[in-house]
Regions:
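Short amphipathic alpha-helical surface micro-motifs
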Residues: 1, 11-16, 31-35, 63-65
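Short aromatic-enriched loop/helix-cap "lid" or pocket-rim segments at secondary-structure transitions
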Residues: 16, 43, 105-106
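Core segments of cupin and vicinal oxygen chelate
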Residues: 1-26, 84
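A short, polar/charged loop-to-alpha-helix boundary motif
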Residues: 98-113
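Vicinal oxygen chelate
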Residues: 23-26, 33-90, 95-98, 115
């Protein structure tokens, strides 16, 4: 594994580090360091959450729902959603590329629980 990119984002006071396996830069792990030392939630296992890019966030969330997965934060904006793994790890889903057009039923769905 090697550091692909490292950058400081001064406006929101974080440092981002992207790690990738040699010869496979498509699969990255993003580590975020919060300069203010924000406390992690109970059961966080020392990290905030995992994130994955998906080709169509609406289709992906619908497939998850069809399998009984609860969407904690629906993709109302056509760009981002949150779910939790069976053992409580928060997982962020991000639309690959530009956000999709906002549409129903997603835009009216409410948040469920925490993420």
């Amino acid at each position: 594994m090697y550091v692909n990119i490292s950058s400081d984002v001064f406006i929101i006071k974080i440092t981002l580090i992207f790690l990738a396996a040699p010869n496979d830069e498509k699969a990255e792990i993003e580590l975020t360091y919060n300069w203010d030392g924000d406390e992690l939630g109970e059961g966080s296992r020392n990290f905030g959450h995992l994130a994955y890019r998906v080709d169509n966030i609406y289709d992906f969330c619908q497939k998850l729902m069809n399998y009984g997965v609860e969407i904690n934060r629906p993709p109302r904006d056509g760009n981002m959603a949150f779910i939790k793994s069976p053992d409580g790890i928060s997982i962020e889903l991000l639309q690959n590329g530009d956000p999709l057009e906002i549409k129903e039923p997603w835009s009216s769905m409410k948040n469920i629980g925490t993420w």
